[in-house]
């Protein structure tokens, strides 16, 4: 599983850099683990150069253990009885005339806890779109709806991969609502008021010298997961950190054993992000080209039909960070009171930062985000 988490981590950072580079004032939020597991399921049916390109894009090198690795990883991360809630909606929707192989369907279920559902895009496109959206909404407890916008599928659609994920967790050290107050958040362009939460407690903290960036680890209850935040110094642009970022550096900067636990004053904005991506252009940039091309796609391990390309890869992700943790909660009145001593180190996220949610046991990056626009 270590090799797999290494592959997923490398893929996570590559995709993160591509998603974020177009406009560095835009927020980014996605789940690399759920995207790579969804694509690995498709990879199971790929052959020839389609498979070679997918393996390169996903940093997976094809051997029999990949799918078993994902099986272990998914059951570890999604297991019941955890103090966090993770709802993943992963499913392939295929045009029913494409004659999908029973073995492939069985393996989707066995390794990825996912189904290939056959629909008739050719006969009733809009009905199929609504059916897919309803299914995702149900799977994510209503937090994620409309994963496919109007017009995103058509009668020629052959294969749609839908991947949505919703996470809810409570902080190990909750922020006290009575200290939350309006505070300015500085972006490159302007200053905006955000609801800034405050907590003084012992947290693991470090400093990445080469990019002049503070590193803070905020654990969730029972410390199975934690949020790791990379906050550049006031005079360092976040773009500098992003440019230098690789998976190797991420591991070095955020290595739990290298961080020191000490009392620190943490200022963190409440945030709520919902991001949707049509991943095709980004996956093409990572070298996955043939899968989307009707003349070249080879998914003969999935269907007896020739030329069944991936028509759409849709990913939608929702996160809310508040005093209790990452979950939706009712708002209460805020008492403005900012009494706090100035002696402890400060970690004040009042300008753009990167954040990652990591699963400790597997060292897997579940989510990657950039908060740069309140």
From Swiss-Prot:
Entry-linked InterPro entries: Serpin_CS (IPR023795), Serpin_dom (IPR023796), Serpin_fam (IPR000215), Serpin_sf (IPR036186), Serpin_sf_1 (IPR042178), Serpin_sf_2 (IPR042185)
Keywords of the record: Cytoplasm, Protease inhibitor, Serine protease inhibitor
Leader sequence residues: none
Site for Reactive bond, residues: 339-340
Source domain of life: Eukaryota
GO cellular component, one term: collagen-containing extracellular matrix
MF annotations from Gene Ontology: serine-type endopeptidase inhibitor activity
GO terms classed as biological process: epithelial cell-cell adhesion; negative regulation of endopeptidase activity
Disulphide-bridged cysteine pairs: none
Entry's localization field: Cytoplasm
Keyword Metal-binding applies: no
SUPFAM superfamilies from the UniProt entry: Serpins
Record family assignment: Belongs to the serpin family. Ov-serpin subfamily.
Disorder: Peeling skin syndrome 5: A form of peeling skin syndrome, a genodermatosis characterized by generalized, continuous shedding of the outer layers of the epidermis. Two main PSS subtypes have been suggested. Patients with non-inflammatory PSS (type A) manifest white scaling, with painless and easy removal of the skin, irritation when in contact with water, dust and sand, and no history of erythema, pruritis or atopy. Inflammatory PSS (type B) is associated with generalized erythema, pruritus and atopy.
Role: Has an important role in epithelial desmosome-mediated cell-cell adhesion.
Protein name according to UniProt: Serpin B8
Gene name, Swiss-Prot/TrEMBL: SERPINB8
């Amino acid at each position: 599983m270590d090799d797999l988490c290494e592959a997923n981590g490398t893929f996570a950072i590559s995709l993160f850099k591509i998603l974020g580079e177009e406009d560095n004032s835009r927020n980014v939020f996605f789940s690399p683990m759920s995207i790579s597991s969804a694509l690995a399921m498709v990879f199971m049916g790929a052959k020839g150069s389609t498979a070679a390109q997918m393996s390169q894009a996903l940093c997976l090198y094809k051997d029999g253990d990949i799918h078993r690795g994902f099986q272990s990883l998914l059951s570890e991360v999604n297991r019941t009885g955890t103090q966090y809630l993770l709802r993943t909606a992963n499913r392939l929707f295929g045009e029913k005339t494409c004659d999908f192989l029973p073995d492939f369907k069985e393996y989707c279920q066995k390794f990825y806890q996912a189904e290939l559902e056959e629909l008739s895009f050719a006969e009733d496109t809009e009905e199929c779109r609504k059916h897919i959206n309803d299914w995702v909404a149900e799977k994510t407890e209503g937090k994620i709806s409309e994963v496919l916008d109007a017009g995103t599928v058509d009668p020629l659609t052959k294969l749609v991969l839908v991947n949505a994920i919703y996470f809810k967790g409570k902080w190990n050290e909750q922020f006290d609502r009575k200290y939350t107050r309006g505070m300015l958040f500085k972006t490159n362009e302007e200053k905006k008021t955000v609801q800034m939460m405050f907590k003084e407690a012992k947290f693991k903290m470090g400093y990445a010298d080469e990019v002049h960036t503070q590193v803070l680890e905020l654990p969730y209850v029972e410390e199975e997961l934690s949020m790791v935040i990379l906050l550049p110094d006031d005079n360092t642009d976040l773009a500098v950190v992003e440019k230098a970022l690789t998976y190797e550096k991420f591991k070095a900067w955020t290595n739990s054993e290298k961080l020191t636990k000490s009392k620190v004053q943490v200022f963190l904005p409440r945030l709520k992000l919902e991001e949707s991506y049509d991943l095709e252009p980004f996956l093409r940039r990572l070298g996955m080209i043939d899968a989307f091309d009707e003349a070249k796609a080879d998914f003969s391990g999935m269907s007896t039909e020739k030329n069944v390309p991936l028509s759409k890869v849709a990913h939608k992700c929702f996160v809310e960070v508040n005093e209790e943790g990452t979950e939706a909660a009712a708002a209460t009145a805020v008492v403005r009171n900012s009494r706090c001593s100035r002696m402890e180190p400060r970690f004040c996220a009042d300008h753009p930062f990167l954040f990652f949610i990591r699963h400790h046991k597997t060292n897997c990056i579940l989510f990657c985000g950039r908060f740069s626009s309140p």
